[in-house]
Amino acid sequence: MTKFKHLLALAALLLAAGAAQAERLKDIASIQGVRTNQLIGYGLVVGLSGSGDQTTQTPFTLQTFNNMLAQFGIKVPANVGNVQLKNVAAVSVHADLPPFAKPGQPIDVTVSSIGNAKSLRGGSLLMTPLKGIDGQVYAVAQGNLVVGGFDAEGRDGSKITVNVPSAGRIPAGATVERAVPSGFDQGNSLTLNLNRPDFTTAKRIVDRINELLGPGVAHAVDGGSVRVSAPLDPNQRVDYLSILENLDVQPGEAVAKVIINSRTGTIVIGQNVKVSPAAVTHGSLTVSITEDPIVSQPGAFSNGQTAVVPRSRVNAEEETKPMFKFGPGTTLDDIVRAVNQVGAAPSDLMAILEALKQAGALQADLIVI
């Protein structure tokens, strides 16, 4: 224990003295087992101003409402006709349970309509248990919703909707009831998982930790994980990780990628994208058809009839654009400059990049989303 205390003190001094233009370890890696868990539940939102579910179309809302009343000893007679609960909506409730969350701590929840409720604005969520993937209840949610959107409709059928009124949030709307075991304090080692697996980054993390704490403290498991020795005492382990997560590590260069969103026309070109020698030209053919009818007017007293003679004009024009050439080692700046010079639109640039990839001149992964 004393050895680890001395080692941590020395590491803190070396860490404070070193200066590097790099990323913190906490920003490029996470600790295995320390993670967020998703919770989900089903409940009712009440207090809506006539914008709730139409129970004739969403029978599960009425069933849920009757089940809730039964828990309070209230039984709805079976001979009652269709009950219209315009102020009630069936909703799904989900939340993220952060690591190390303890019973009694509040967490935010998101509430979304399941039925055909027009708006959840002004509603209150009744007590809803939130379960994990194992079926255990980890939190209980309840409270007033904060809805950013709104919906308004006139008698003549005119309607306006701003944002999404059928979903909202409850800040600190759930209370944690059960903690999730993390395994953080078990074993004599910890595993760091890289957010973006890379062999170069993994090697640099190992070298940086061993340089600071001594050889053999860290070793790479693969391109996405690094295992480090850790003290058994929980207090020392926290001190140990507080030093590791603030280490400066220079990540490896990302794989060259070009991302194309064909729906929005967005194109993102990575910094390391290069193009082999190639010549590119991209023209467009425009075909226009115009109707120019001629009116035939007969002479006076000729007993003729006025007639319209159709006449169509078809014109084809091909826009010529200069050819631009990519030399060896062309970078992102060169590509952007060349494309701007010819005035290519996003759709034109997509076609050019796809053609360069097919020709084997684009040295990058082309990803269409």
UniProtKB/Swiss-Prot annotation:
HAMAP family: FlgI (MF_00416). One of its GO terms (cellular component) is outer membrane-bounded periplasmic space. One of its GO terms (molecular function) is structural molecule activity. The basal body constitutes a major portion of the flagellar organelle and consists of four rings (L,P,S, and M) mounted on a central rod. The keyword Signal applies. Pfam families: FlgI. This is Flagellar P-ring protein. Assembles around the rod to form the L-ring and probably protects the motor/basal body from shearing forces during rotation. It comes from the Bacteria. It is found in: Periplasm; Bacterial flagellum basal body. Residues 1-22 form the signal peptide. It comes from Pseudomonas aeruginosa (strain ATCC 15692 / DSM 22644 / CIP 104116 / JCM 14847 / LMG 12228 / 1C / PRS 101 / PAO1). Belongs to the FlgI family. Keywords: Bacterial flagellum, Periplasm, Signal. GO terms for biological process: bacterial-type flagellum-dependent cell motility. The keyword Calcium does not apply. NCBIfam families: PRK05303.1 (NF003676). The lineage of its organism: Bacteria, Pseudomonadati, Pseudomonadota, Gammaproteobacteria, Pseudomonadales.
